[in-house]
Every structure is written in C-alpha cells, then in structure tokens.
Amino acid sequence: MREIVHLQTGQCGNQIGAAFWQTISGEHGLDSNGVYNGSSELQLERMSVYFNEASGNKYVPRAVLVDLEPGTMDAVRAGPFGQLFRPDNFVFGQSGAGNNWAKGHYTEGAELVDNVLDVVRREAEGCDCLQGFQITHSLGGGTGAGMGTLLISKIREEFPDRMMATFSVVPSPKVSDTVVEPYNATLSVHQLVEHSDETFCIDNEALYDICMRTLKLSNPSYGDLNYLVSAVMSGVTTCLRFPGQLNSDLRKLAVNMVPFPRLHFFMVGFAPLTSRGAHSFRAVSVPELTQQMFDPKNMMAASDFRNGRYLTCSAIFRGKVAMKEVEDQMRNVQSKNSSYFVEWIPNNIQTALCAIPPRGLKMSSTFIGNSTSIQELFKRVGDQFTAMFRRKAFLHWYTGEGMDEMEFTEAESNMNDLVSEYQQYQDAGIDEEEEEYEEELPLEGEE
C-alpha cells in the first residue's frame, strides 16, 4: 500500500540516492543484496512502500537510476549496495550533459526521457496504490537540473494526481561547483515552482558547516554530507514505512505545509547530531531534540530562519516518545518564539510520531519548515543570475542547444515573483486594515 517510486538523476542525485537506499535498507533489516535478515515484524509490515518483493525473499527498491553518462552509475553498481537495484532500472546515456541545463532538458535528456518513463511506468504498474514520486537531484548541474526537471514535468503530465516530492541540492553561497550554476538553478526553480508539490532544499555549504561545527569532522567528505541528507530523507518518510500513533504521508505533509501552491520550498533539519565521540556523554530527551532541531545551525539550507517567519512546520519524532511531551514542547516553542511564526496561521506546527527509531539511536527527530527566509537563497541565486545574464555571459552554450533568451527572462522573473511572494506573506499581519487589501487585489490577477 501507498508506494513511492524513487528517481535519482545526475551525479549528485545518484550519490544521495545511493546513501538513502543504504540507510533505509538498514532500517528494514535488509543486507546489501536485498535479503531480509531483520529481527522485527515491524520492519516487514510496510516494506512495500519502497521495495518490491522478488522471489527468494529478496526485496528490490522501486528506484529508477538516471544519468546522461555511465560513470556515476558504474560507481553505484560497484558500491556496497550495487547488487540491490534491478539492473533494468539503470537508464543512462553516453554523452553527458556537461553542466548544461539545455542539454539535460532539451537535447540529450529529451532523447533519453522516454526510456526513463517506460521504466517509471513499469514501476508504477507494480504498485497497489501509488502515492507519489520522490526525486533526488541537484539544481546546479546539467543532468539533475535539466533532465530532472524534464522528468518531473513529464511524470506530472502522466500522473497528475500523485504527489511529487523533490530533494534538491541548491547552490551554496560560497562554494560553487560550476560557473553556470546560477543559470541552471534559476531555470530549474522556474520548473519546480510549477510542477513539484514539495521541494526539500539542501545545500552543501550548510551540510559542511554541520559536519565541521556539530559533528566535529575536520575535512568532511561527500559521503558524510550524503549521510546527513539520507538521515533527513529517511525521517521524512518514516511514517509511511513504520506504523505510528500519528502518521503522516507525502500528501498529508503537503496539505499541512503548503499554504499557497507556489510556496512549497522547505528547509530541513535533523536531530540528534553529535560527534561520534560524544554520543556516550549525552542522554537524548524530547526537549533537547526540540531545541536542536529548531536551531538555525541545524538547518541543511543556508538561510537563517531568524530573518523570516515560519508559515508552517512539521516535526517528526521517532522512538519511544510520549505524545504529551511532544505537544508541550511544540507549544513551548511557539509561545517563546512567536515572532518567528506568522500569526495568521494558528498552531502551525504539525507533529508525527513513529515508534521505531533509526539504527543506533534511541530517539530522533526530523524537522521540516516552510519559512519565508528561504527567499534569501533564491535572492542570492537570482542576483548571480542577473549579473551574468546582463552581460549575456555563457549564453551561447544554451542558445546553441535551441534555447531562447526569452526563457531566461521568464525564469528570472518567475524567481523574482517567488521572492516577492515570500516577502509579502512575511510582512502580512492578522490585523491589517481592509483598505490595504482592496488596493492590492489586482496583484493576484496578474499571474
């Protein structure tokens, strides 16, 4: 019941995806070949959300792995969990997108997209009651950004009523992988605003900070970063995979988290994060988890929620946690930090509980926040975009693949609209005079 089909596109998406499958295979008691050797009935009860049962007690992920070059795929196949995936579900090209969004979205990616959709269709047909799709990708490159967004819009066309969740690695403020990142990211956000239902924003710099500051790793590897992301991904879907007192699924999450359809970009966090040596010195309690997960240092996207306000939040607790304690803590957070929550959505923290903690922890919590401060992130990318676009730098790579400058202008203005929508709701109060709204009404109709 309630299956999720997982897609991973591009190098970043495949690496995060591989870490994610490693994490949840462990939670469900599967070894690296997908054979069950767990101890608890609960691990099997809702295995079908992410896994198909094959013959011989083997479980196969409902995952579609996509890339425009074979390199990353080979790495996944050679990795510790390479034997887990169904070989037909690897779909790859040979040419690569070369960090060019247009190649991923219009030329190279468009040639491969039908093969991917065939695999997606086959996975969807193997489901009892498909709940939706989740896709891991980055927004700065060519394949994950360009082809990832193409897949999202194609899947949207074919499955209009299913949820579409994306785990998107957004460009970091200081660390840039490629010069054309602002272009790729802006073009991607332009697509995500229209086609995704919930986008969890992650960025490498924030992850580096968490690794250095909290986990005390002197030089974190991508493996460490991916481990953090997979912890969050596992937390977001935990309620689907294990029975709990207060369940939530992708759709419930969206209903509770998205007050206006375009504003579906979330910040995520995870607690407890402690350095490996310090585990034994701490007892984890609900107040401590709450404090850590509402800590700006714990957010996996580089925007500080103290510069904005929360429209909505969701807190997912795992482990032996008392319902009452959670509710008290949430009330506590809201009353102490009321200035960080918009007052026109009362009680805007949704909670979910699940009895089974992640491996190696007694209890944990996952935080998802829809904060207006995420606009900082878009603003930053938008400014970099404008700086390059004004001089038409690097544009020939995109126009050469058949793109039009108009598209860039549209993407830019869509992103600016998004920023100003966040700003508008950040400033909106509950007791504003009626007259103000009457003047503002025409704004709504422009879209």
Curated annotation (Swiss-Prot):
Requisite cofactors: Mg(2+)
Compartments where located: Cytoplasm, Cytoskeleton
Keyword Signal: no
Alphabetized UniProt keyword annotations: Cytoplasm, Cytoskeleton, GTP-binding, Magnesium, Metal-binding, Microtubule, Nucleotide-binding
Binding site for Mg(2+): 69
Residues given in the record as GTP binding sites: 11, 69, 138, 142-144, 204, 226
Predominant location category: cytoplasm
Disulfide bond annotation, renumbered to this chain: none
PROSITE patterns referenced in this protein's UniProt entry, alphabetically: TUBULIN, TUBULIN_B_AUTOREG
Gene Ontology MF term list: GTP binding; GTPase activity; metal ion binding; structural constituent of cytoskeleton
Biased composition (Acidic residues): 429-447
Membership in a protein family: Belongs to the tubulin family.
Subunit field text: Dimer of alpha and beta chains. A typical microtubule is a hollow water-filled tube with an outer diameter of 25 nm and an inner diameter of 15 nM. Alpha-beta heterodimers associate head-to-tail to form protofilaments running lengthwise along the microtubule wall with the beta-tubulin subunit facing the microtubule plus end conferring a structural polarity. Microtubules usually have 13 protofilaments but different protofilament numbers can be found in some organisms and specialized cells.
Protein name: Tubulin beta chain
